[in-house]
Amino acid sequence: MESDVIADLRCKLKETEEERRKAAQYGLQLVESQNELQNQLDKCRNEMMTLTESYEQEKYTLQREVELKSRMLESLSSECETIKQQQKMHLEQLEETLSRSHGQEVNELKKKLETLKAELDEARLSEKQLKHKVDHQEKLLSSKSKEMQMSERVHESVSSETLTLQIELTEMENVKTTLQEEVNELQYRQEQLELLNANLMRQVDRLKGEKEEREKEAVSYYDALEKARVVNQDLQVQLDQALQQALDPNSKGNSLFAEVEDRRAAMERQLISMKVKYQSLKKQNAFNREQMQRMKVQIATLLQMKGSQAEFEQQERLLAMLEQKNGEIKHLLGEIRNLEKFKSLYESMESKPSANSVALEDDTYYTDLLQIKLDNLNKESESIKGELSIQRMKALLESQRALDIERKLFLNERHLQLSQSENMKLRAKLDELKLKYEPEEKIEVPVLKKRREVLPVDISTPNGVCAPSAVGEEDYRLSPQKEEAQSCSDGSEDNNLQLEKTVSVSTSGVILSPYKSLTLDIQPRKEKKCVKLTGVPADLEALSERSRNTPNSPRLAAESRLQREVKQGKETASKLEKAACKKSYPTVYVSSKSTPETQCPQQ
């Protein structure tokens, strides 16, 4: 039997080995085919890039020709515009001169017209005054002639007193007439002064208008002078530049310009090739983004499927609990039936002694004692049954509470999964919007910082002692990294992640200087740790970590707590050991570059 079992196991082992070999061969074939496809893709991409570069070069040459023709057209159009501007300037100057001459003539004619108006007003006023004087003199003459006639008539018939009074009256009338003439003269003088004042006011208004016009002309002259100065300065600068170019000995030859033109053409070709490469890389990046978007959508759908699977598991668990409770109920019903049978038997047994009580009056004392004990036992059994029922009720309450808590936990887990799926969908939508509205992102190149290691120099140890200590320190430093890598590999088994961990440790060499035999120039080991996760992008890795960190049940929560406590204990222990290892030694800074002879790769 054992030999048959061993033979079967050996056959199974051979079959598994053959299957593994076949799987390895298929994997190698797939890898080779993938490499061939990648090489073909690279070749096609290079061909496309060369073709695009040639097309871009042709496009650039055509653009240059078009630019030259456009420049020629622009130069011709600029010449036409300059001629038009010159003609416009000439016309504007002619218009300005004609307007000025016309304004001057109009002003002269206005002056003459005003002078003629003033003379006409003066002549009219003098004529009016003279007419008024003539009328007044005629009235005086008529009144005097009448008075003379009256005086001659009265002189003959009137006495001397009346004559004196008449003489005085005539004198007073003469005085009155003289005063009246003076008043008229003053009125005439006032009218002349008013006319003169009006003429002067007109002249003042006219002079103000002329002053404003002269000020405007002065402002226009000043603006034209400033423009002429600016134009003169520009022309002077152009003249100075032309003189400097004429005096510059380097500008006389064409070799420098040809070299500059060649360099410019080479740089433009390089720029075109870089643009083509940039466009191809941009398209590749967009394709990778689309793939990432699809993966995120698939992860969201998987999360939704996981939520539905959790519902099915919960339903199965509830059905199992229901079956268990039904079995318990059946068992309790059977016990109740047995107890009813026992009770019926006990009642029948009690009825029989009651019927035969007359015959058994002379029973012994032991029967009474047993009866008392039986009664006590019945009472105790009843009390125990009551306590048992109370405990059963308590157990039912606790089970009900546990069921309620499990329901709440399940609802919370379902809400969590739904929120995770919605979060993934929102992230996918956000990435789509970013791709639409923010297609170009600024890529920040990470700056590599050089590390400087601190080595003790006071203790002079030989090479054989230094090397093991350094190796021990490096192993100690590598141990937490190995633990983290193991934890990552254990956690990412579901996603089929391949963890590649390369650690290159460069051995340190000790060189003694020829002049100082005591000082040691020690080159420390440089640790290069790089952990690469192939097959899954960073977003999927973060999502897998989140999905691992989300507790799906109390058992998983307890396990995660235990893992955290263990990790914290390990971290504290490593910190304490590092603090104990660190001592106050004088530091020396050594270059972190390692030679190819001293490198020792480890995996």
From Swiss-Prot:
Domain of life: Eukaryota
PTM per Swiss-Prot/TrEMBL: Monoubiquitinated with'Lys-48' linkage. Deubiquitinated by USP45.
Region (Disordered) residue spans: 542-577
Phosphoserine: residues carrying this PTM: S513, S553
Record-annotated membrane-spanning stretches: none
Residue ranges with Basic and acidic residues bias: 561-577
Statement: the UniProt record of this protein carries the keyword Cell division: yes
InterPro entries: SPDLY_chordates, Spindly/BICDR_Dynein_Adapter
Record localization: Cytoplasm, Cytoskeleton, Microtubule organizing center, Centrosome; Chromosome, Centromere, Kinetochore; Nucleus; Cytoplasm, Cytoskeleton, Spindle pole
Listed GO biological process terms: cell division; cell migration; establishment of mitotic spindle orientation; mitotic metaphase chromosome alignment; mitotic spindle assembly checkpoint signaling; protein localization to kinetochore
Function: Required for the localization of dynein and dynactin to the mitotic kintochore. Dynein is believed to control the initial lateral interaction between the kinetochore and spindle microtubules and to facilitate the subsequent formation of end-on kinetochore-microtubule attachments mediated by the NDC80 complex. Also required for correct spindle orientation. Does not appear to be required for the removal of spindle assembly checkpoint (SAC) proteins from the kinetochore upon bipolar spindle attachment.
Assigned protein family: Belongs to the Spindly family.
Quaternary structure and interacting proteins, as annotated: Interacts with KNTC1 and ZW10. These interactions appear weak and may be transient or indirect. Interacts with dynein intermediate chain and dynactin (DCTN1). Interacts with the catalytically active form of USP45.
Name listed for the protein in its UniProt record: Protein Spindly
